[in-house]
Every structure is written in C-alpha cells, then in structure tokens.
Design a protein with these regions (language model features):
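Nucleotide 5′-phosphate-binding alpha/beta core
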Residues: 1-101, 107-126
C-alpha cells in the first residue's frame, strides 16, 4: 500500500473513532485543528497573511469572536491574483503539490494548487 493510501486509511480510522466522541471533545479538537490551519495560512500564504489579521491578537492567540470580520473569498479573487494563494511551503508529510484548473464556465477560470490529501477531500465533498 502506498504512503498516500496509508495516510488515507489513518484518516478513515480516525473518523470512525472520533464520530463517537462527546460533542465538547469534538469541538475542542476542531478548534485545535482550525488554529493550526490558520497559523499555517497566515505564515505561508500571502493572501491570508493580510486577510486573517483581524482574528489574531497581538500575542498571537486567535479571537474567534472576530471571525465575522474576515472577508468572504470570492472566485474572482482567486482568478485575479492566483499567486497570492500559493503557500510558500506545505508540511512535508502532506506530499507533492499539484495544480488543477477549472473550466472557466462561470467567466472566472481558476488555477489552484493542492496536495494529494486535499485533492482527495475535495473529490469526496459535494
């Protein structure tokens, strides 16, 4: 089994286990994961370095009470400045970065980059 499929199997096992967690434990875990994602995005992605500023306090902690102040990302934002959305680096265990393109049928074709796990999640969600 490839490393990618081993990682997918671990995610599946985790989901099967965590579906039975108490709501408070699940919420705590989700907030912890969201904090890691926000810190990575702010540190590595030019667009998010600026746009996430309202939720970060001076000490680096995150104020989720200001979440409503974050700008809504629009498709044209991605189309007009795709390089601003590219992470300078991704965690090594996330694998190779690949590019995908949309058809542009909406009038705003988008070119984006993702790792294999992110691409699989994108395919799995409606």
């Amino acid at each position: 089994m490839s490393k990618q499929w081993q990682a997918a199997a671990r995610v599946f096992e985790f989901l099967m286990e965590s579906q039975h967690w108490p709501a408070a434990d699940l919420r705590d875990y989700q907030l912890q994961q969201l904090e890691q994602l926000l810190r990575h995005a702010r540190a590595q992605v030019p667009y998010y370095n600026k746009s996430l500023a309202p939720v970060f306090r001076g000490d680096g902690s995150i104020n989720f009470g200001r979440w409503h102040e974050l700008p809504i990302l629009k498709r044209e934002d991605l189309a007009q400045n795709p390089d601003a959305f590219n992470a300078a680096s991704v965690p090594q265990n996330h694998g190779k970065v690949s590019e995908f393109r949309t058809s542009g049928s909406t009038g705003h074709p988008v070119v984006a980059r993702h790792t294999w796990p992110a691409g699989q999640c994108r395919k799995a969600l409606p």
